[in-house]
């Protein structure tokens, strides 16, 4: 299969080594900037447990991480309300990390299933916006 030849075949030792080398967990010590992770709890490609692993590894290293989880999403955010809320989080997150302005969240979280297990403090206005939701 083309996919396995490009990213690694977990059924072979060579493939396992390739997957390990490409895994963010292998390189967590090299992450030096805040990270935003958006995850669908029902993602069949990137399991929630994998996102949980990188979040935990970053927390152990005291690397700032914001973890946004959507319990009703899979790979990619299909529900418009969830997409809108993630765009709002991303805009504020990037504003804090890179500088510049962002549109304060208004109704961006209405109807969204967004949860933020960790890192809410790295996104300006997120705590307040979710409290109004």
Descriptions of predicted regions:
Residues 1-133:
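Active-site-proximal cap/loop segments of hydrolase catalytic domains
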